[in-house]
């Protein structure tokens, strides 16, 4: 890596690892995109630090398996150690798995659908200060509206903005961050 300090939000071990290896790096793997979408949804009202600490509990979120879940499977998942104990969010994961598979079938892959919003090229905001980072933008509002029309839940524009960053469609590394140019 070049000189400079990493983005200041990355403070804990989990945050630093996520920042250095995933955040704002283009992802075109459907399974990873689904996992990230669910992590972002589960994060609503919680800290990203907590989600990253409990990420291992989400690692088996396979959309094809989740799409077939009923109430018994949801209850069993909620009883598992490390999982965020929120029925609404757990049920949402099942709903989103079904919607995710429908989009993947329509577009050939979920990645193809997602990346069409940016014509396959990450948006680089070239941020100079942390306070310049928006919580949402026009792109996240458009993607959010379309996902909702397709039956997804917990996909408001703020969650979608974070998702687009995490999936690498938006590069919001500060220009002074050594990871700014990675993946562009």
Identify what each model region corresponds to:
Residues 1-184:
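HhH-family (HhH-GPD) DNA N-glycosylase catalytic core used in base-excision repair
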């Amino acid at each position: 890596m070049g000189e400079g300090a990493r983005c200041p939000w990355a403070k804990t071990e989990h945050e630093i690892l996520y920042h250095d290896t995933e955040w704002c790096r283009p992802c075109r793997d459907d399974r990873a995109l689904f996992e990230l979408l669910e992590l972002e949804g589960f994060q609503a009202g919680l800290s990203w630090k907590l989600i990253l600490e409990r990420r291992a509990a989400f690692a088996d979120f396979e959309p094809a398996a989740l799409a077939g879940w009923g109430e018994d499977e949801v209850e069993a998942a909620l009883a598992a150690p490390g999982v965020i104990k929120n029925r609404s969010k757990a049920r949402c994961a099942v709903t989103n798995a079904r919607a995710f598979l429908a989009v993947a079938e329509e577009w050939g892959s979920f990645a193809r659908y997602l990346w069409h919003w940016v014509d396959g090229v990450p948006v680089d905001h070239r941020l100079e200060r942390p306070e310049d980072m928006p919580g949402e933008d026009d792109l996240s509002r458009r993607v959010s509206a379309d996902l909702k029309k397709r039956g997804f839940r917990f996909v408001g524009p703020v969650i979608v903005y974070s998702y687009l960053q995490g999936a690498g469609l938006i590069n919001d590394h500060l220009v002074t961050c050594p990871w700014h140019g990675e993946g562009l």
